[in-house]
């Protein structure tokens, strides 16, 4: 029997609750909570959710908990990216909030597509050896139980931005490059990270199709 789903994705742009940081979390919540509520999403994918720390406890997503408080999402199943220590990353976590049970969760980062090696040609001092170029954040892959023996495969991904990656000796300050060539190489490396991770997503999708006997794709 067909099922109707509302899936939504939302980049919350470094959602955090740092003291004195503007705009204040309360001000952001006043704007964002009504927007998220209006989505009425069965499954909500979020990007750039920062983690917060409490003394003696693992880093968690406290700012997100405050954002969804009092909304239907407060009772949803949750999966998010974690460090090797099992706690949320300090910045830019991926999160899935689901009305349906999350049956499995997996992080993928240079697992299906190994890190390429590259020697920067504009670095100061010059690099003599190639170095690994890895993705900046993982892919979050979850499966959801839709009932009646149906599984939804969901991939939440936040690709590298087009902002040039740093090149040793080529930055005067955070916003100023020493040479256009240095800027161009930084842009190239960012492109390498972005396209490489997109390749890893494509490989993952192909593996899902191979491993599952019955796959339905809805493009609506």
Q: What are the functions of these language-model segments?
A:
Residues 18, 125-129, 183-194:
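Surface-exposed cleft-lining segments at the edges of enzyme active sites
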Residues 1-94, 174-179, 193, 198-202, ...:
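N-terminal, active-site-proximal structural segment of metallo-dependent hydrolase catalytic domains
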Residues 132-138, 190-203:
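Alpha-helix-centered segments that form part of catalytic cores
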Residues 165-191:
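A solvent-exposed, charged loop/short amphipathic helix patch at secondary-structure junctions
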Residues 12, 48-49, 100, 159, ...:
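Active-site metal-binding loops of divalent metal-dependent hydrolases
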Residues 56-164:
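Structured beta-strand-rich core segments of catalytic domains in phosphoester-bond hydrolases
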Residues 209-220:
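Metal-dependent active-site segment of extracytoplasmic phospho-/sulfohydrolases and closely related
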């Amino acid at each position: 029997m067909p099922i109707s789903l509302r899936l939504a994705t939302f980049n919350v742009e470094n959602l955090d609750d740092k003291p004195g940081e503007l705009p204040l979390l309360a001000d952001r919540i006043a704007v964002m909570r009504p927007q998220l509520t209006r989505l009425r999403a069965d499954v909500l994918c979020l990007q750039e959710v920062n983690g917060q720390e409490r003394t003696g406890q693992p880093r968690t997503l406290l700012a997100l908990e405050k954002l969804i408080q009092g909304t239907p999402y407060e009772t949803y199943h949750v999966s998010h990216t974690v460090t090797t220590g099992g706690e949320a990353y300090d910045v830019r976590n991926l999160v899935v909030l689901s009305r349906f049970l999350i049956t499995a969760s997996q992080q993928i980062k240079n697992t299906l597509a190994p890190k390429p090696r590259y020697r920067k040609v504009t670095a100061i001092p010059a690099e003599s050896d190639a170095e690994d170029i890895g993705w900046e954040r993982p892919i979050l892959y979850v499966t959801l139980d839709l009932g009646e023996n149906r599984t939804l495969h969901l991939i939440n991904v936040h690709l590298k931005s087009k902002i040039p990656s740093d090149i040793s000796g080529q930055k005067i300050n955070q916003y100023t490059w020493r040479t256009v060539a240095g800027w161009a190489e930084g842009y190239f490396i960012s492109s390498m990270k972005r396209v490489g991770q997109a390749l890893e997503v494509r490989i993952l999708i192909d593996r899902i199709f191979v491993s599952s006997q019955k796959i339905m794709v809805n493009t609506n």
